[in-house]
Amino acid sequence: MNLKMARYESARPKLRARAFRLCCTAIALTAALPSVRAQTDEIQVYDAAIAEQGKVNLMIHMNFTPIGWKTPRFPGAIIANDSFQATAEWAYGVTPWFEQGLYMPVSSPHSTNYGGTFDGFKIRELFVRPHADEHTFFYGLNFEFSVNHHYWEDRTYTSELRPIVGLHLKPWDIIFNPIVDTDYTGGPGNLQFNPSLRVAYNITGRWAVAAEQYAGFGPLHHFVPVNQQFQESWAVVDRTSKTINIEAGVGVGVTGGADRLTFKLMLSRDLN
C-alpha cells in the first residue's frame, strides 16, 4: 500500500502538468471557435441623414424573429427564436454636420428564455456631410459605445465604427456601411467586419422600396467559413410624411449564422 501511495505521490506533478495542458488546450480551442454575430437592436443602413440643427428626433426600432436560432449564440444569451426587440433612439441635431444620439432603453419585451428584459444602452456620435440628401455623393462616420447586460452581448462594453458612403442617382440610391465592431479584446485583428448595403428606388418623394444586405464575416484577421457567416437579405419599404416616417421590412437568413426569418418596423418623427 505504501509503495502504491509513493508511486501516486511521485506521479502527481506529471498529472497536474497534464491537466494544466488539457485546460489550456480547451481554452485555446474555445477561443478559436468562430464568433457568431449577436442579436441587434437596430437593422438599418445609415444614409448620412441627421436631425436638423436644434431638432429632437425619436425613432422606435422593433424587430421580431419568428424563425431564428433556437439555442443561445453564446452562453447565457437571449434565444433569438420567437424573440421581440424594441429600442428607443433619441437624436439631437447639434450642427448641420453632427448629431448626438442615445439608445435608451435597448430592450427585449419578449424572449423564450428570459421573458422581458432591459438589455442596455448606447451613446452615439454621427458626423456627416451637411445636407447629404442634396448631394450626389455623400459620406459620414458613426461611432457608438454600448453598455450591455450579459444576456445581450458576451462583453459589457462594445463599440461600433460605421463609415457611410453613398450615391444619390435619382431615382436610385446606393449606400454602403463598412462597419467594424469591437469588444475591446484581441487587438485590431479581432475587429469584427459587419458591413451592410442598401439599394433603393424612390417611387415618389414619399415612397421608396429597397433591397438591403447585412453581413457578419467575423474577425479581420480570419473570416469565418461562408456557411457560418451572418448573411441576411432584406426587402424594405419606406414612407415619409410630415408627421411620421415609417420603414418596414422582412429579412431572410441565407447562411447558418443568420436567423431564418426576421421582421422590422421603424417609426420616427421630430418632437419639436
Sequence positions of predicted segments:
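Hydrophobic alpha-helical segments, especially transmembrane helices
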Residues: 17-22, 270
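Bacterial N-terminal signal peptides
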Residues: 21-32
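Transmembrane beta-barrel domains of Gram-negative outer membranes and organellar outer membranes
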Residues: 37-272
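N-terminal secretory signal peptides that target proteins for export/translocation
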Residues: 1-17
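Residue-level detector of alpha-helical hydrophobic segments embedded in or interacting with membranes
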Residues: 8, 29-30, 158, 173
